[in-house]
Amino acid sequence: MIKALITKDASIIYEVINKAARAYRGTIPDDCYHDPYMPKQELRREMAIMNLFGWYEGGKVIGVMGFQSVKDVTLVRHAYVLPEYQRKGIGTKLLSHIEQMTKTRHLLVGTWSDAFWAIQFYQKHGFKLLPEKDELLKKYWNLPQRQIETSVVLGIET
């Protein structure tokens, strides 16, 4: 079941994101990975600017995904599923929910260029790698230059 997540859910969101993000260790550049991957203060800032949803099973949040409207597009933000629940359709259900909520013509997602599993997930759902990724990352995200250099953008028309 999908439910909107709110401030009081921050600790479980923190847990899901940081457990799932361990997959990045050894994959993304060492200077871009840190533990925790998303500190609590950063999570609070992110929650203030986007809508975040959780997939619940047995009363427990096991996956999270958010969206943020920026200018003329919608961004998929912070898509994570606990490792033991991955490849069971939870990410697909959350992404479908985000697509239904999208009110703009374009839905974009940024991810690490070496996170092949994430890229394949979005491609499976019709997203295409966009060649103008540097311009898009600078226009719609607020990222350090190093992350821009090591990321890709995928998009789909809604």
Q: Positions of the model-derived regions?
A:
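A short beta-loop-alpha structural element at the N-terminal edge
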Residues: 1-15
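A short helix-loop-beta-strand connector motif used in the catalytic cores of GNAT acetyltransferases and
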Residues: 41-54, 147-150
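Conserved acetyl-CoA-binding loop-helix of GNAT-fold acetyltransferases
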Residues: 81, 87-100, 124
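Conserved acetyl-CoA-binding loop of GNAT-fold acetyltransferases
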Residues: 123-132
